[in-house]
Amino acid sequence: MSRSLHDQTLALAGLCQAATLVQQIAHNGNCNEDSLETCIRSLFATNPASTLDVYGGELSDIREGLTVLSTVLAQHGQPQDVEILRYMFNLIQLEAKLKRSPDMLDVIGNRIEQARHTASHFGYSHSNLLGNLASIYADTISTFRLRIQVTGNPQILQRNENADKVRALLLAGIRSAVLWRQSGGHRWQLIFTRKKVISHARELLR
């Protein structure tokens, strides 16, 4: 896997897109369907030719992530930006814990592979697949002491279909966090090379 700023920015955009969709669902009960499919599809990209291929091969697939990334890292201090950043940092922390749990990694990998048939049969945004992926997250990542507190409208979050989407997207966020680390990303980068990431994300949006 390439360790360039380009690849790190793409992976961060994927992570940011998942976090953004979690926020949208938690507050509004809906999100962009194409962006959702991109995130879920990334879980099944096990042998990508490039980082962009993980997300479908086109920059348009992660345009929402690139757009929000260039905004939230600019530290304008908007409450919605802070919330997305919190989700992103929490997912990066959870991925670091997961890396030290090879047995759990194997379980997740095997169960995602089992879900591949559901994905190919029903599509990446079907409730059957989202429920399947949500159960993987609940049975594995959710058992860590560090847990992501999703804030939003309680009535919306109590609906099973919304809870499933949120958990499936958090699992996709972990996938992007893995990709980011594999391409050379680390937490300090978000502080010290933030401006470079913002600049490159904006270049990719042109």
UniProtKB/Swiss-Prot annotation:
Q: Cite the PANTHER family for this sequence.
A: HIGH FREQUENCY LYSOGENIZATION PROTEIN HFLD (PTHR38100:SF1)
Q: What is its main location?
A: cytoplasm
Keyword set includes Lipid biosynthesis: no
Q: Which gene encodes it?
A: hflD
Does the keyword rRNA processing feature in the UniProt annotation?
no
One Pfam entry name: DUF489
Instruction: Supply the alphabetized keyword list.
Output: Cell inner membrane, Cell membrane, Cytoplasm, Membrane
Membrane topology note: Peripheral membrane protein
Name the source organism.
Answer: Marinobacter nauticus (strain ATCC 700491 / DSM 11845 / VT8)
Gene Ontology cellular-component terms for this entry are: cytoplasm; plasma membrane
Q: Where can this protein be found?
A: Cytoplasm; Cell inner membrane
- Which InterPro entries does the UniProt record give? HflD (IPR007451), HflD-like_sf (IPR035932)
Q: Which family does it belong to?
A: Belongs to the HflD family.
What S-S linkages are listed for this chain?
A: none
> How is this protein named in the record?
High frequency lysogenization protein HflD homolog
